[in-house]
């Protein structure tokens, strides 16, 4: 099943997409609700190697005119992670919903044997100034 705008709004518990950022931020601060919602997302889409909110945020929340918010296509994110290669420290200063860092994380973990890979070997830091994007970024991480 594909995560559509309607499904995401239902999982977050809202009727209109403009309510998503505030509602999601409240859920993130409640451990039980956060974990329950994450499991609900996983039941629909268990692929952790992509940004669940990429299309949703771009369609419903991006402010291209005022803040020049635009999203990196998955193909470019994958290419950049290959060009950069495995590295123990990673920084995205305009992370949006996290699609670049998700691809970097996926590339790093897939570049090693499952017997050698430890999440503690890598540090990922994301920065985002948009109050609307921040809850989606936090949920993705």
Predicted segment positions?
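Acidic-enriched, low-complexity/disordered segments with a strong bias for Aspartate over Glutamate
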Residues: 22, 30, 45, 49-51, ...
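A near-ubiquitous, low-amplitude feature marking generic local secondary-structure context
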Residues: 39, 59, 63-64, 88, ...
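Conserved S-adenosyl-L-methionine
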Residues: 74-141
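A short N-terminal interaction module
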Residues: 1-59
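Conserved aromatic-histidine-acidic binding/catalytic patches
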Residues: 44, 64-69, 125, 129
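Class I SAM-dependent transferase core
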Residues: 48-82
């Amino acid at each position: 099943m594909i995560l559509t705008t309607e499904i995401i709004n239902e999982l977050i518990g809202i009727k209109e997409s403009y309510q998503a950022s505030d509602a999601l931020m409240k859920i993130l601060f409640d451990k039980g609700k956060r974990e329950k919602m994450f499991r609900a997302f996983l039941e629909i889409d268990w692929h952790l190697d992509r940004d669940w909110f990429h299309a949703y945020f771009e369609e419903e929340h991006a402010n291209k005119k005022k803040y020049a918010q635009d999203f990196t296509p998955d193909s470019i994110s994958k290419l950049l992670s290959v060009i950069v290669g495995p590295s123990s420290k990673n920084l995205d200063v305009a992370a949006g919903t996290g699609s670049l860092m998700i691809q970097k994380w996926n590339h790093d973990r897939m570049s090693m044997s499952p017997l050698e890979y430890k999440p503690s070997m890598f540090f990922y830091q994301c920065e985002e100034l948009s109050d609307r994007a921040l809850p989606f970024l936090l949920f993705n991480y």
